[in-house]
Amino acid sequence: MGLVSKVVPLADLPAAARAYAEDICSCGPLAVQAIKQSVYRGGRMTLAEHLKYEQQLASEVFMSEDAHEGLAAFREKRKPRWKLR
C-alpha cells in the first residue's frame, strides 16, 4: 500500500520530513489537492465509488492549464509556473 516509504533514525527525522514535504510542494498544486481530496473522501466510499471519484479527479487535473504547463516545463527543462487553473 505504500504507507512507509523511508525509515530514518530519530535524529534525522526533522530533516527527512522537511525534504519529503519540499518534494510534495514541488509538485503541481492541483494534483496535490486532488490526492488530498481522494484520501480524505475515499475512506467513506466503496472501492467502486472511490475508483470512479479518482477517475473524475484525474480527468480534471489532466485537462487543466497546469497539466499543460507541467509538460511544457518538463520538455523545456525549466521549473513550472503554476496558475492553479
What are these regions (language model features)?
Residues 1-3, 78:
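Active-site-proximal glycine-rich helix-loop-beta segment
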Residues 72-85:
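Terminal low-complexity tails and localization/encapsulation signals of metabolic enzymes
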